[in-house]
């Protein structure tokens, strides 16, 4: 599905979509390939998702949207304020929660963490709260910069404790150089499963001897 603004040439765009579907039908069975349209009310779609993001627990960690006040439904040992903005990472996805639980299990004060695909910075922030001395996050999306910065401020994490690099750690030699090999006690990667295949042999290069690689894949389906 997709949205079109009123100013766009809807007839031309829809005609192009129909032509593309007809071409695709020559190679595979995609069903009737019909195109339907409807009008929708004008909303702030960039922020509409906030209606569905409310506080939740990951074991004894309470994660609260930054625009809400926490409600103690049960005791917690960590409070995390989060606003992912347009970056990935509310913490609600099961794979993110699996990584959070592994961080709780393995983090010791004074450790260092490399978080590949940091998004909103949620895994790095959990690490900071658990006693990680230094987090380096990497991400392809420039939106991660403002998201991480705002979430650091909301959780009183000093700038020197969590740094961020925008770029591809798999292919970008400059990002690889900035990260530095064998520098981290932990590497986390909670990203699309098909990215983990080329990433994993690269990610382990940044671990200290005996370090731990925590990963959880998200299917792009």
Predicted regions and their residues:
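S-adenosylmethionine
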Residues: 140-221
């Amino acid at each position: 599905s997709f949205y079109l603004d009123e100013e766009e040439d809807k007839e031309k765009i829809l005609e192009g979509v129909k032509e593309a579907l007809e071409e695709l039908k020559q190679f595979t069975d995609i069903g009737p390939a019909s195109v339907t349209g409807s009008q929708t009310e004008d909303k702030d779609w960039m922020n509409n998702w906030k209606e569905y993001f409310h506080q939740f627990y990951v074991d004894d960690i309470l994660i609260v949207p930054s625009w809400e006040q926490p409600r103690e439904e049960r005791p917690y040992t960590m409070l995390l304020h989060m606003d992912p903005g347009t970056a990935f990472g509310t913490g609600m996805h099961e794979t993110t929660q699996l990584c959070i639980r592994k961080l709780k299990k393995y983090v010791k004060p004074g450790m260092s963490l490399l978080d590949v695909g940091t998004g909103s910075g949620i895994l790095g922030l959990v690490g900071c709260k658990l006693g990680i001395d230094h987090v380096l996050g990497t991400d392809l999306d420039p939106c991660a910069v403002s998201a991480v910065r705002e979430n650091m401020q909301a959780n009183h994490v000093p700038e020197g404790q969590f740094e961020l690099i925008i770029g591809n750690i798999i292919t970008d030699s400059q990002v690889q150089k900035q990260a530095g090999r064998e520098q981290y006690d932990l590497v986390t990667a909670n990203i699309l499963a098909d990215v983990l295949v080329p990433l994993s042999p690269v990610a382990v290069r940044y671990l200290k001897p005996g370090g731990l690689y925590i990963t959880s894949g998200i299917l792009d389906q």
